[in-house]
């Protein structure tokens, strides 16, 4: 009887041990799963924070919807702009645009003539413009017969052939050199049947750039709303980023929230066929004839 009792007790102890082991392993597995989930969330949050900090402080992507900088920049070019180039202001910090964390700019660096800059226009603060910087604070800027004069000195301007747009429109192409040596191309609508485009902004009054503000022009001189027209002068505080290079470009846009899923799918093929491979990773400051 003692042996039977001993055997029964031993069997019971073994079962109890196995059950305890199973419970321990299950609890340990659940604990490991919880730890893994927590670690995954921490990693995800860290990645998001790093991505946001890169966008806010270092580099941001911008899509150009208009042709005011044609042919340097075309419609639907996607551009990377460096946020640190001129320091930081309320308007250069993504997601904090209108919170007004501080006044002016911190870590400010001086812009240079010829820089292509993304900024908020004073007359339309809910949007972004991209133009070329021409006039610095204290400068006198004037256009006479389409030629830029800075402080009464004519910049170098040499005709460099014809540019034909994707729509078939012809433009006269000019190589311009600013006083600091920066060179770029500007474009003017070519005559149609010998008739010149009505050039009411090729001759302007003199613009005296105030302290802390800047004068901008679009490279597409006949089709740009810039400092000659409604834009006026742009405060330094409104600068967002310095445009650097094109990372992607298409002739047509794909995404449109108004056309529905089926039409988006149907649009995918022509959109892919419209990719401008020759513009991908193009430096905006390289001169290509």
Swiss-Prot record:
The gene is lepB. InterPro entries: LexA/Signal_pep-like_sf, Pept_S26A_signal_pept_1, Pept_S26A_signal_pept_1_CS, Pept_S26A_signal_pept_1_Lys-AS, Peptidase_S26. Residues 65-289 are periplasmic. The chain crosses the membrane at residues 44-64. It catalyses: Cleavage of hydrophobic, N-terminal signal or leader sequences from secreted and periplasmic proteins. It is found in: Cell inner membrane. The active site is at residues 68, 131. Residues 1-43 are cytoplasmic. This is Signal peptidase I. It is an enzyme of class 3 (hydrolase). GO terms for cellular component: plasma membrane. Belongs to the peptidase S26 family. GO terms for biological process: signal peptide processing. It comes from Rickettsia bellii (strain OSU 85-389). It holds the Pfam family Peptidase_S26. Keywords: Cell inner membrane, Cell membrane, Hydrolase, Membrane, Transmembrane, Transmembrane helix. GO terms for molecular function: serine-type endopeptidase activity. It is a single-pass type II membrane protein. Its EC number is 3.4.21.89. SUPFAM superfamilies: LexA/Signal peptidase. The lineage of its organism: Bacteria, Pseudomonadati, Pseudomonadota, Alphaproteobacteria, Rickettsiales.
């Amino acid at each position: 009887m003692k042996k039977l009792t001993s055997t029964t007790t031993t069997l019971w102890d073994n079962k109890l041990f196995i059950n305890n082991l199973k419970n321990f392993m299950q609890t340990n597995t659940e604990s490991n799963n919880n730890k893994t989930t927590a670690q995954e969330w921490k990693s995800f949050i860290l990645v998001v924070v790093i991505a946001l900090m890169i966008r806010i402080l270092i580099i941001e992507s911008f899509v150009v919807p208009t042709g005011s900088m044609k042919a340097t920049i075309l419609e639907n070019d996607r551009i990377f702009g460096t946020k640190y180039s001129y320091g930081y202001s309320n308007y250069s910090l993504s997601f904090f645009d209108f919170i007004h964390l501080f006044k002016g700019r911190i870590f400010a660096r001086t812009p240079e003539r010829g820089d292509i800059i993304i900024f908020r226009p004073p007359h339309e603060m809910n949007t972004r413009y991209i133009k070329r910087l021409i006039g610095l604070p204290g400068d006198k800027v004037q256009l006479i017969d389409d030629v830029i004069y800075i402080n009464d000195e004519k910049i170098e301007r040499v005709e460099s052939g014809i540019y034909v747009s994707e729509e078939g429109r012809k433009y006269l192409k000019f190589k311009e050199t600013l006083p600091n040596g920066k060179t770029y191309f500007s474009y003017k609508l070519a005559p149609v049947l010998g008739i010149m485009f009505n050039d009411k902004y090729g001759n302007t009054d003199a613009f005296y750039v105030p302290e802390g503000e800047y004068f901008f022009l679009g490279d597409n001189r006949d089709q740009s709303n810039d400092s000659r027209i409604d834009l006026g002068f742009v405060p330094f505080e409104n600068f967002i980023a310095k445009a650097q290079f094109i990372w992607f470009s298409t002739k047509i846009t794909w995404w449109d929230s108004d056309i529905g899923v089926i039409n988006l799918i149907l649009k995918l093929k022509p959109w892919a066929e419209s990719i401008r491979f020759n513009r991908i990773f193009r430096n905006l400051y390289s001169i290509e004839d």
